[in-house]
A protein has these predicted regions:
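Short, compact, well-ordered microdomains
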Residues: 95-115
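Long, hydrophobic N-terminal alpha-helical segment
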Residues: 1-31
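Catalytic phosphate/metal-binding cores of nucleic-acid and nucleotide-processing enzymes, i.e., regions
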Residues: 43
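Residue-level recognition of beta-strand microenvironments
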Residues: 54-56, 92
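Short beta-strand-centered aromatic/proline hotspots
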Residues: 48-54
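Short, solvent-exposed secondary-structure boundary/capping segments
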Residues: 59-69
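Conserved small/polar residues in nucleotide/adenosyl-binding loops
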Residues: 129-130
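Short coil-to-beta transition motif at edge beta-strands of beta-rich domains
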Residues: 30-38
Length: 130
């Protein structure tokens, strides 16, 4: 299972927290289960949860699968302007908040990812959150 740090807008985090959002869409995703620490951007600016992702789907496959539903195809085509993949959100866990200031203070060279960073070869953020 890959470990990564994913960045989220507060509105997206809120939808995951509420159980409304069941897929996470990105331009690139590895084709394997992911445990992601959730960094929430301004105004929160903190790691606030962990999300488990699995079962990567290509949006182009969904376009073919739902080709008889014009509304679904239109939504999929809109998503394809920005994303290639969707992964199922299989689990969510809220954690204690770790502020950006604390992360920068305690982890030399810490930078918030624009989309995501792998933590497999960088155990410091992982050990910080446990």
């Amino acid at each position: 299972m890959r470990k990564m740090l994913l960045s989220f807008k507060p509105s997206v985090y809120d939808k995951i927290y509420a159980g409304i959002k069941i897929f996470e869409h990105r331009r690139n995703f590895p084709n394997e289960p992911i445990m992601a620490y959730m960094y929430v951007s301004k105004p929160v600016r903190a790691i606030t949860g962990i999300v488990m992702l699995d079962n990567r789907h290509k949006l182009s496959d969904w376009e073919n699968d739902f080709n008889t539903d014009s509304d679904a195809v239109a939504r999929i085509q809109e998503y394809q302007k920005f994303y290639r993949y969707a992964m199922e959100i299989t689990e969510f866990q809220e954690t204690n908040s770790i502020s950006l200031d604390d992360l920068k203070k305690d982890i030399d060279g810490f930078v918030v990812p624009q989309s995501y960073i792998y933590l497999d070869n960088n155990p410091r953020p992982v050990s910080y959150t446990h």
